[in-house]
């Protein structure tokens, strides 16, 4: 079976989609965003196609596309859509699959189910994206604790933003996890710049093995 990698984050708006695009491009993978909330601006799938350099057929359609830009549970209620979490199964593809969640681990899909509940059922290796700015230590360690409590395999932490060596080190040490690398802020955000930035900071094979 080809590698299946779930990309999640400690919070929303930290650059998780940009990282997912870089990872999918580096692995020549297929990308899937199960639930998209908000359709007025560029969707995450659209951004990944633009930034990854992948062909359109490598971007799988979302299982749910919600018009309202809100947490999936609320967006679904406003839009009159019932999210069937049991129907959210990992697609079967012949190449590596990069799956992107929404916001953080505890984002609710329904009034009863959060993203991390689905991740636990999938049991696929997970990459935790974390910002490097103030407050990241607490948010990241809490996220790692939630992941470990559910026995989800954790590949490691991918840091996003300006260098902050002490924060990165203490997270790795106290979280007993692996630092996968750090994607810096890019002056120009396009497919070529992102590909180069990822290649300089990460080793693709670290995402293809078993969680340490």
Curated annotation (Swiss-Prot):
This is ATP-dependent dethiobiotin synthetase BioD. PANTHER family: ATP-DEPENDENT DETHIOBIOTIN SYNTHETASE BIOD 2 (PTHR43210:SF2), DETHIOBIOTIN SYNTHETASE (PTHR43210). It comes from Rhodopseudomonas palustris (strain ATCC BAA-98 / CGA009). Belongs to the dethiobiotin synthetase family. One of its GO terms (cellular component) is cytosol. Mg(2+) binds at residues 17, 100. The keyword ATP-binding applies. The active site is at residue 33. The lineage of its organism: Bacteria, Pseudomonadati, Pseudomonadota, Alphaproteobacteria, Hyphomicrobiales. Keywords: ATP-binding, Biotin biosynthesis, Cytoplasm, Ligase, Magnesium, Metal-binding, Nucleotide-binding. Homodimer. Substrate binds at residue 37. The gene is bioD. The keyword RNA-binding does not apply. One of its GO terms (biological process) is biotin biosynthetic process. Pathway: Cofactor biosynthesis; biotin biosynthesis; biotin from 7,8-diaminononanoate: step 1/2. It is an enzyme of class 6 (ligase). It is found in: Cytoplasm. Its cofactor is Mg(2+). Its EC number is 6.3.3.3. Catalyzes a mechanistically unusual reaction, the ATP-dependent insertion of CO2 between the N7 and N8 nitrogen atoms of 7,8-diaminopelargonic acid (DAPA, also called 7,8-diammoniononanoate) to form a ureido ring.
